[in-house]
């Protein structure tokens, strides 16, 4: 099998409009959670989220196009541009051998909501002709492939909160099997809208700490009461190791393991077994290396954090890696989370630093591992793992190693 490496990364979330500012804020333990400003949430049981701030879509999309493109696509375009520029390709790039895998859990939910209201109040003839394209998850990859001229495979993953991680696995397969030499992975989500917040709130999935937003998301803490919705995008450029080496590319990391599994249990409630099998598969594919750090799924929900902790204990026994969840800082970005957290994991490898799990305030007997509480830690990292688990029992895990 061909070796697959990361040569470009990009990221946008509630803590920054690019990868460097985002990662710095994450490592500093800052929180991007605050009161919702994208709509009036006064009458909602949940009034907080991790919104991308100071984002100007006109810097990404031409003025005439802004209303035609949903916010999740706008954020994705921004992160993809950063990753492509970071990869430093020349003009001679063979774009027929360059593909894309896009990921989103919900896609253009704000546009679906908006046009549903228009249809109900003003009739079907008033629906925008751009509504359907703007709502489709695969339009994220479609528009980015058009912008960059990428003519290889164009695939989309829609597996809830595991989508971004599954997209990385699909990119690996495309390169390893010879269907492409390079792949761009982009996960994006922007579901902070009345229907999005209202829907998750009705499931009792979200934290209701409206008066203390920055301490609301508290992964692995005993007093966690649900996740905080986030938005953003993460992008990674993958290519064959030999190709990257030949062109003198900066290699951030090698993707050495990928695992996926299904719980086959419940539409929303996770199991211990499913995540455990995904992690086992990823480790087996990687050759069972010593893992130094796990970027956990760590959603701040009572069941997930307990189950993920138990699965990690069962898998690693007495050799448990350092663990942290960065969702306390970025919020839970749903289908974009896996891509964003893969970027964070790769940057942790690059800089030799493990981001903290913020809001670790009250110890939980069922979550009793080293989650890097509140303050980042300098560590010589060689191998890192990133987990993503989604509704419908979809599980994904990736393993990266530093390339000497």
Enumerate the predicted regions with their spans.
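Condensing-enzyme catalytic core mediating Claisen C-C bond formation in acyl metabolism
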Residues: 3-7, 30-34, 211-293
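Cysteine-centered functional microenvironments
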Residues: 59-69, 102, 122-130, 134, ...
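Glycine-/small-residue-rich "gating" segment that lines the acyl/pantetheine channel
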Residues: 121-128, 169, 173, 190-246, ...
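Acyl-CoA/ACP chain-elongation machinery
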Residues: 179-225, 258-272, 298-305, 320-370
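A glycine- and small-aliphatic-rich helix-loop capping segment at beta-alpha/alpha-beta transitions
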Residues: 20-27, 110-124, 174-177, 197-210, ...
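Conserved beta-ketoacyl condensing-enzyme motif
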Residues: 6, 27-159, 188-199, 290-303
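ACP-dependent fatty acid/polyketide chain-elongation machinery
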Residues: 1-65, 242-254, 343-357, 401-404
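Active-site-proximal alpha-helical scaffold in enzymes
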Residues: 76-88, 137-148, 154-189, 228-249, ...
């Amino acid at each position: 099998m061909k070796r697959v490496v990361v040569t470009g990364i990009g990221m946008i979330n509630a803590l920054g409009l690019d990868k460097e500012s985002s990662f710095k804020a994450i490592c500093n333990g800052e929180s991007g959670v605050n009161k919702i400003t994208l709509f009036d949430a006064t009458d909602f049981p949940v009034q907080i989220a991790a919104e991308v701030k100071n984002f100007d879509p006109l810097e990404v999309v031409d003025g005439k196009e802004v209303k035609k493109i949903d916010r999740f696509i706008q954020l994705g375009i921004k992160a993809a541009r950063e990753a492509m520029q970071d990869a430093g390709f020349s003009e001679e790039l063979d774009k027929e051998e360059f593909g894309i895998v896009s990921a989103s859990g919900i896609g253009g939910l704000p546009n679906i909501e908006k046009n549903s209201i228009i249809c109900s109040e003003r009739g079907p003839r008033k629906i925008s002709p751009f509504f359907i394209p703007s709502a489709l998850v695969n339009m994220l990859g479609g528009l980015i492939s058009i912008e960059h001229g990428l003519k290889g495979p164009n695939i989309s993953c829609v597996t809830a909160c595991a989508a971004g991680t599954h997209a990385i696995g699909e990119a690996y397969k495309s390169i390893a099997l010879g269907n492409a030499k390079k792949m761009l992975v982009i996960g994006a989500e922007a579901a902070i809208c009345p229907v999005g917040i209202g829907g998750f709130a009705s499931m009792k999935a979200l934290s209701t700490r409206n008066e203390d937003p920055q301490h609301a998301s508290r992964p692995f803490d005993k007093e966690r009461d649900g996740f905080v919705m986030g938005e953003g995008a993460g992008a990674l450029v993958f290519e064959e190791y030999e190709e990257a080496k030949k062109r003198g590319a900066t290699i951030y990391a090698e993707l050495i393991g990928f695992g996926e599994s299904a719980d086959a249990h419940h539409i929303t409630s996770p199991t211990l077994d499913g995540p455990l099998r995904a992690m086992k598969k990823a480790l087996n594919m990687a050759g069972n290396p010593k893992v130094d750090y796990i970027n956990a799924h760590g959603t701040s929900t009572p069941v997930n954090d307990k189950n993920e902790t138990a699965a990690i204990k069962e898998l690693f026994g007495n050799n448990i890696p350092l663990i942290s969840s960065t969702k306390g800082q970025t919020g839970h970005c749903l289908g974009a989370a896996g891509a964003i957290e893969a970027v964070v994991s790769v940057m942790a490898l690059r800089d030799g630093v493990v981001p903290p799990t913020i809001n670790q305030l009250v110890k939980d007997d069922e979550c009793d591992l080293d989650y890097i509480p509140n303050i980042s830690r300098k560590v010589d990292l060689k191998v890192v793992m990133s987990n993503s688990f989604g509704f419908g029992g979809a599980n994904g895990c990736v393993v990266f190693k530093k390339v000497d």
